[in-house]
Structures are given as structure tokens and as C-alpha cells.
């Protein structure tokens, strides 16, 4: 009788191992990461200008004035990007807080079902082999 119980235990152990190996794995939990925020580039600092020494002789007035732009007017300024319009933005593809508040699927019930099924099978094997 003792060997039959051990034999039933091994059969049930093999059955349980088979059932648990085929059990669906719990779904991985996803963490919601905020979308990356683009930081504006630092503002360009104007280059220090040196004052030219005073001219000894006046410049001729017949030459046209130089049309070189001043460095302060062409200095790039940091500005936020313009809105793209009614197109789909990356923010719309991200999950909303209502999606994040949904509870994750419970895989414990699935594993409990396999454990209960294994116990029922163990009882049946014990009754049949006894």
C-alpha cells in the first residue's frame, strides 16, 4: 500500500509539472514613462565686442556704406517649436491616465485553477490506485 501512495504521488507530480509548464505566464507589468521633453538650447551669449581705435583720417564719403549685418540682429534665438497643426502628435499615441488606472490581469486565478485541478487529479489517482 505504501508503494502505491508513492507511485500516485510521482504520477501526480508529473501531471502537475506538465500542467504548470503549460500555464500561461503572468503578463509583464508595463510602466508608463512620460514622453521626453525637449529642452530648449541655451540662449546664445553675444560675443564681447572691442571698440575700434579712433580713425586718424576720416573715411572717404564716396564709398557706399557696408551692408554687413550686425551680429546682434542675426544671433539665433531659442524659441519653442511651432505647433504642427491637426496632425497626430506623439502625445496622442501615449497611453492615457484612464488606461493606466486599469488593474493588470490577475494570473493568480489561472495558477490556482491548475493547483486545484492537480489536487482533484491526485485524489482520483489515489482512489483508483488504492
Swiss-Prot record:
Claim: Glycoprotein is one of the keywords in the record: yes
Residue positions, PTM Pyrrolidone carboxylic acid: 22
Protein name: Classical arabinogalactan protein 7
Segments of this protein annotated with the region Disordered: 22-108
Membrane-protein topology: Lipid-anchor; GPI-anchor
Propeptide: 107-130
Source organism phylogeny: Eukaryota, Viridiplantae, Streptophyta, Embryophyta, Tracheophyta
Signal peptide: 1-21
SS bond list: none
InterPro entries according to UniProt: AGP
Amino acid at each position: 500500500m505504501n508503494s502505491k501512495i508513492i507511485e500516485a504521488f510521482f504520477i501526480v507530480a508529473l501531471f502537475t509539472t506538465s500542467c504548470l509548464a503549460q500555464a500561461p505566464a503572468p503578463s509583464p507589468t508595463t510602466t508608463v514613462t512620460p514622453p521626453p521633453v525637449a529642452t530648449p538650447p541655451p540662449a546664445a551669449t553675444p560675443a564681447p565686442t572691442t571698440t575700434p581705435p579712433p580713425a586718424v583720417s576720416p573715411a572717404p564719403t564716396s564709398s557706399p556704406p557696408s551692408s554687413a549685418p550686425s551680429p546682434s540682429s542675426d544671433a539665433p534665438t531659442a524659441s519653442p517649436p511651432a505647433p504642427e497643426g491637426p496632425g497626430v502628435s506623439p502625445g496622442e499615441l501615449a497611453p492615457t491616465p484612464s488606461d493606466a488606472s486599469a488593474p493588470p490581469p490577475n494570473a493568480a486565478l489561472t495558477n490556482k485553477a491548475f493547483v486545484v485541478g492537480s489536487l482533484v487529479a491526485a485524489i482520483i489517482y489515489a482512489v483508483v490506485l488504492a
